[in-house]
Each structure stands twice: as C-alpha cells, then as structure tokens.
Amino acid sequence: MPKEEVLEFPGVVTELLPNAMFRVKLENDHEIIAHTAGRMRKNRIRVLTGDKVLVEMTPYDLTKGRITYRFK
C-alpha cells in the first residue's frame, strides 16, 4: 500500500498543551495543534516554546499535525 500524501510546513511552537501536545504557528499564519512523532519521543527530543519545528500534516485534516523535526 503506498504511503499517503503528507504536507510538510515549518512553524514555531507557541504554546505547550497537556498530553504532549503543542500549539504551532505555521509560516502561512495558520495555528494548528500538533504532537511529537514516535521517533522524537523515543530519542527524548525536547520541544519547548519558541522552537522552530517541521510539521507533517495530512490533507484530510488541516487542523492537526505531527512534529517530525526540531531545528537547531
């Protein structure tokens, strides 16, 4: 089965929410709610307010996403 199309956008974490969720402001001024990807949790990569991140989203729900990378 082919992997479904995902959209990737850079953004900035604006708020930490409960249950390892984050409010992220994308470069196109949209605000979404995102959680960290499994590999980031496994490697214990911390995400804090103000961090620049790469968010992966599905075209079906543009209000939720997955943080896949934290820029240095």
UniProtKB/Swiss-Prot annotation:
Q: Which GO terms describe its cellular component?
A: cytosol
SMART domains registered for this protein in UniProt? S1 (SM00316)
Q: Where does the protein end up?
A: Cytoplasm
Does the keyword RNA-binding belong to this entry? yes
Q: Name one GO molecular function term.
A: rRNA binding
Query: Could you name the domain of life of the organism this protein comes from?
Result: Bacteria
**Per UniProt, which keywords does this protein have?**
Cytoplasm, Initiation factor, Protein biosynthesis, RNA-binding, rRNA-binding
* One Pfam family in the UniProt entry: eIF-1a
Please list the residue ranges annotated as the S1-like domain: 1-72
Against InterPro entries, the record matches this protein to:
NA-bd_OB-fold, RNA-binding_domain_S1_IF1, S1_domain, TIF_IF1
User: Does this entry carry the keyword rRNA-binding?
Assistant: yes
Q: Which family does it belong to?
A: Belongs to the IF-1 family.
Q: How does it assemble?
A: Component of the 30S ribosomal translation pre-initiation complex which assembles on the 30S ribosome in the order IF-2 and IF-3, IF-1 and N-formylmethionyl-tRNA(fMet); mRNA recruitment can occur at any time during PIC assembly.
State what this protein does.
One of the essential components for the initiation of protein synthesis. Stabilizes the binding of IF-2 and IF-3 on the 30S subunit to which N-formylmethionyl-tRNA(fMet) subsequently binds. Helps modulate mRNA selection, yielding the 30S pre-initiation complex (PIC). Upon addition of the 50S ribosomal subunit IF-1, IF-2 and IF-3 are released leaving the mature 70S translation initiation complex.
Matches recorded under NCBIfam families: infA
This protein is called Translation initiation factor IF-1
Q: Which organism is it from?
A: Chelativorans sp. (strain BNC1)
Point out the gene that encodes the protein: infA
